[in-house]
């Protein structure tokens, strides 16, 4: 079968890559074309557009890059039209993906499956109307979403487990439990440049009182999650401006 996937950020890229591997296990002849990232590309298929070119958030950033986003939408529709996949699989990223779902559904091109459902319980609950009209099957990685969709909105949804739990288990199997060498704070500033720029400096200022320079090893260790598509220089520059002791901070990919 031919699968067209769309993931618009680093987490979606990671989860979509695992989904592609699972599909290959049951459909060895599967072929993929996708909007995604490095993780999906490592599995195989054809990367049509990297998510870093479309990962904008907030009114101002979206407005500034609107021509790029609209070009991405037009190209995505054209690629689906010309390739004629057997299924379109949307991974999170609802602002873009629901527009694609609408197009594919109205053109009756193929079934539309949504993996990692839009977080309409948090905001933009009105998106349930688009989901109901244009999505054939919805898959959730958060168990409480089942009650939300089925009891509140009477829309069927399937809980398929949380891939992040699998990632944690795999990491601990490879690296073992963290060493008890003091306290650790994980900072997760996001995967988009704007998120990182806006969030990380504030996070570092919040933890700075715990990392003041003193004798011996610091009691608190700061671990910053580095997004796959972002250069490390972006993080180191923000850390330096924050004035934290270098030995207290570690970038983790």
Language model regions located:
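Charged active-site motifs of nucleotide-sugar-dependent glycosyltransferases
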Residues: 2, 180-186, 221
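Glycosyltransferase donor-sugar binding loop
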Residues: 222-233
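Nucleotide-activated donor-binding/catalytic signature segment of Leloir-type glycosyltransferases, i.e.
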Residues: 235-253
